[in-house]
């Protein structure tokens, strides 16, 4: 996997990232006191930034052999489904407990402001399929770590975990240290 997007030179890539970062709304003390919530709805409202994010993901993976994109509930669906469509591959949702209608495999985890369980359909991934997991944001790494465990339980081969935003100070990478990680943006010290 390339360190940056193959068809975007470094200065253009940085300009795009700076423009996208400028559209992220930061909401202090939400959903609980002490948390700065990075609101991506502003990225979705602006057609240029939404397209740029989707294009960056597509450019990164367009030359790779990928079988399925796994998107994490709920904002990972927004980018993961577009990526799957553009790549011509299947999309597998990872949902909060009780939201999938068929037989599931579940994984509990701790996140930045609580506890949660996520699930995936037990027939969503076949042994050896090449998978990219997509979510909007990586903070403490609890959600992505649980999603990685679910994909591995089903026999998927994770090529990379991809995020629009990463909060490196919360050390989420440590929970998935054995995975390749791609983040379009980082918000440090916040």
Annotate each PLM feature.
Residues 2-66:
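Active-site-facing substrate-recognition patch
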Residues 67, 129, 159:
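Conserved acidic residues
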Residues 89-131:
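Short, glycine/charge-rich flexible loops or terminal/linker lids adjacent to PRPP-binding catalytic cores
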Residues 34, 69, 91, 161:
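Residue-level signature of catalytic and energy-coupling elements of molecular machines
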Residues 2-16, 145-190:
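PRPP-dependent phosphoribosyltransferase catalytic core
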Residues 78-87, 148:
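Short Gly/Thr/Asp-enriched flexible loops that form oxyanion-binding sites at enzyme active sites
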Residues 136, 141:
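Conserved G/P- and acidic residue-centered "switch" motifs that form tight phosphate/ATP-binding loops
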Residues 66-73:
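Short glycine-rich phosphate-binding loop at a beta-alpha junction
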């Amino acid at each position: 996997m390339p360190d940056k997007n193959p068809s975007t030179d470094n200065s253009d890539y940085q300009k795009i990232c700076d423009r996208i970062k400028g559209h992220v709304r930061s909401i202090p003390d939400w959903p609980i006191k002490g948390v700065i919530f990075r609101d991506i709805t502003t990225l979705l409202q602006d057609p240029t930034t939404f397209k740029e994010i989707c294009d960056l993901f597509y450019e990164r993976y367009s030359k790779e052999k990928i079988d399925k994109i796994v998107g994490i509930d709920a904002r990972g669906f927004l980018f993961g489904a577009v990526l799957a469509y553009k790549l011509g591959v299947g999309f597998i949702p990872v949902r909060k407990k009780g939201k999938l209608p068929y037989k599931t495999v579940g994984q509990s985890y701790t996140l930045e402001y609580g506890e949660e369980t996520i699930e995936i359909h037990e027939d969503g991934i076949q042994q050896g399929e090449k998978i990219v997991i997509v979510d909007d944001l990586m903070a403490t790494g609890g959600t992505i770590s649980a999603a990685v465990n679910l994909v591995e339980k089903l026999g998927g081969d994770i090529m990379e975990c991809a995020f629009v935003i990463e909060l490196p100070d919360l050390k989420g990478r440590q929970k998935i240290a054995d995975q390749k990680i791609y983040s379009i943006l980082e918000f440090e010290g916040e």
